[in-house]
């Protein structure tokens, strides 16, 4: 027969497993981008993994102090797009809302522009 102390330890262990096992982390699909304006202003396409109606962009490298204006588009229907959001060295992260319903599990890409020719930005984009 198991002692009370051992039963409590087993019960505590099982409870901890249930709590941590049921909390599955959810990660949105993210793609790295390397964009040069005006040369290559688009990110790789990536499927949107959730139904959150926002996109996220973070610059990790900026070749200059200019501003990069970013907008997310649905690949199959470019009438589905987000508001335009700016990132820069001093404000490298931003998020924007989609202007119409952005379906999950279809492909999106980010397009960007800057008034500063030759600006290069590397970073992450999550549709």
Descriptions of predicted regions:
Residues 29-127:
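Mature secreted bioactive peptide module from preproproteins
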Residues 1-48:
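N-terminal prepro-regions of secreted/extracellular proteins
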